[in-house]
Amino acid sequence: MKNITILGSTGSIGVSTLEVVSAHPDRFRVVALTAGNNLEMLRQQIETFRPQMVSVLSEKLAVELDRSLPGYKPEIHYGVEGLIAAATAGDAHMVVAAIVGAAGLVPTAAAIRAGKDVALANKETLVTAGRLIMDLVRDKNVRLYPVDSEHSAVFQSMEGQSRKDVLRIILTASGGPFLNLPLDQLSRVSIDDALNHPNWSMGRKITIDSATMMNKGLEVIEARWLFDTPAERIDVNIHPQSIIHSMVEYVDGSVMAQLGVPDMKAPIAYALTYPERVPTGVNPLDLTALSGLTFFKPDYRRFPALKLAYDALAAGESMPAVMNAANEVAVEAFLSGVIGFIDIAATIARIMDAHEAHTLSTIEEALITDRWAREKARELVGLVRR
């Protein structure tokens, strides 16, 4: 029986994780859950999984949750302290880090410090403080299992192989909803257009990141740290069918790939049960039903955010933190109708231009850098034309 904590249990990854847990009650016990402000869903999860501890966004929500629970009541925490309490809960063997954005950095680091293995769905943690987090992983001798479908595919394609034999990593990307839209129409796309992903069902923020391909840029940076591979050996291929989730090319010319229908339950289950595999309910892949698998290079004119991610990696380790923070603010501004779609990348570029990259010595320095970039981006979005 593996005891798990889920940070972000009411989000897309959290819900899928609990579906995997429900399918295998003999394997998993839920110790702690954290959520933002979706109390209705959290109440249902508490009733079903009876965690020892939960945490919500604020004290007000914690009081409201406590009053609304008719039966079983776990310990109720709130805020950053609540996230840390859940992440370090003594009974947990593994923490699923599924909080969206840089907000996941502090509790994920706390889980690692507490000696917990981590199933990492929060790519922003490694984008914001990659070297520091990986140093912590090695120091505490814990395992970091990738949950992102692309990184899970790379992880699986490297199993049993020597890292010195890896020539390059090839991350695949669907291209999102605007892959074939004429470039001159990108400035006019609506929020609903951007949220209409062709292949994956995800949260709002990551869906916008997929439309700009910033999501793939974040994944390039995450792969750099997860697999200790320099950016020049991490390529991105557009693969509209989303069947091959990523590939690894070796020095002998062999290419290992992981295939499957687009469903996050598969990589989640592998992270939870590694090195075993369990049934997930994911539909089987019928290759004969596919008309073909296509691949091509991304166009930086269409996806400038992807180029910004490579630029951030090249600039130095504080720059990805700045890029990520600016992106989070810009996406929030777009989803609020404050700026247009093409203004997202333009906002990020402006904030990156205003930052002089430097080495990050501590998690706190990474957080300070993150806060600086957010403040600058918030100032800027009020000046960007809609």
From Swiss-Prot:
Coiled-coil residue spans: none
Binding sites annotated in the UniProt record for NADPH: T10, G11, S12, I13, G36, N38, N122, E124, G203
Cofactor(s) the protein needs: Mg(2+); Mn(2+)
Metabolic or biological pathway: Isoprenoid biosynthesis; isopentenyl diphosphate biosynthesis via DXP pathway; isopentenyl diphosphate from 1-deoxy-D-xylulose 5-phosphate: step 1/6
Function: Catalyzes the NADPH-dependent rearrangement and reduction of 1-deoxy-D-xylulose-5-phosphate (DXP) to 2-C-methyl-D-erythritol 4-phosphate (MEP).
Family assignment from sequence similarity: Belongs to the DXR family.
Name of the featured protein: 1-deoxy-D-xylulose 5-phosphate reductoisomerase
Primary gene name: dxr
